[in-house]
Amino acid sequence: MQFIDQANIILKAGKGGNGIVSFRREKFVPAGGPSGGNGGRGGSVILMADNNLQTLLDFKFKREIIAEDGCKGGPNKRSGASGQDTILKVPCGTEIRDIKTGIILGDLTKDKQSLTIAIGGRGGHGNAYYLSNQNRAPESFTEGKDGEIWEVQLELKLLAEVGIIGLPNAGKSTLISVVSSARPKIANYPFTTLIPNLGVVRKMDGNGCLFADIPGLISGAADGVGLGHDFLRHIQRTKILVHLIDAIAENPLHDFEIIEQELKKYGKGLLDKERIIVLNKMELVDDDYLQIITKKLEDLSKKKVLVISSSLKKGLSSLLSEVWKRI
């Protein structure tokens, strides 16, 4: 499935139905009073969160959503039928923003949570509405009101509790594949992962915790280099960041600093999040070098550094234990 996490769409509520002019005409009532009914309300456009959806792909080609118009009024003071509301299902974690003002209209984070965006137009009045002592046979009516039109941006931000971050080829996909049921594409070259991968990791008590493997960030990500903005937004909701560093990289310390700088530049509280620093691929370097680089990383980060091997499944219990302490 193609992963689409942003979409601009136009939402058009239905027009209210027109009122009508009608007079009661029956066999023994040749000159009855006004009986024109009111028009029905136009349908509204409602967004609803759905746990079964993972992407905004449905809106890639469907840019305009139009709700049903209300029906016109009828004789004998019958009101027209209201237009049917249009319910758009979106993934949990979808934020809705007004494109014109930039104002956030809502944030749908729970299954079945809904938000009415474009409200249907009110139905017009039929001539029965205008009956008065001064006017016993009104011929006035009003047309239905237009429905609201909104141009909005949908932005999906994943609801994972733990985000796994790091430069390309740090081993993020391998890690999530061995601690969860996720099965991302894995290969020994950068940028294998082009979309976030989600996996549920079970704790000792049986409860699940959602992990997200965020595609490799690079220098300049906070300024939009590569797909940086697209990926960084997905860690805004996480509680903990697992910063994975490749032990066989040319300069692991520099790699660490690149990601830290991108978090700082992007802002939005990313640098304030709990972070667990992890040195991966311990099996590919000798013990002396591993001790040296671990100590230097701890001095640089002012944090304890965990050492693991995702491929050999070493050190993972210590890593998960550290995660559970901080959730």
UniProtKB/Swiss-Prot annotation:
Q: Can you give the residue ranges of the OBG-type G domain?
A: 160-327
According to its UniProt record, where is this protein located?
Cytoplasm
Q: Listed disulfide bonds for this chain?
A: none
Task: Provide the binding site for ATP.
Answer: 166-173, 191-195, 213-216, 280-283, 309-311
Listed GO biological process terms: ribosome biogenesis
Keywords, in A-Z order: ATP-binding, Cytoplasm, GTP-binding, Hydrolase, Magnesium, Metal-binding, Nucleotide-binding
User: Which family is annotated?
Assistant: Belongs to the TRAFAC class OBG-HflX-like GTPase superfamily. OBG GTPase family.
The protein, known as: GTPase Obg
Phylogenetic classification of the source organism? Bacteria, Bacillati, Cyanobacteriota, Cyanophyceae, Synechococcales
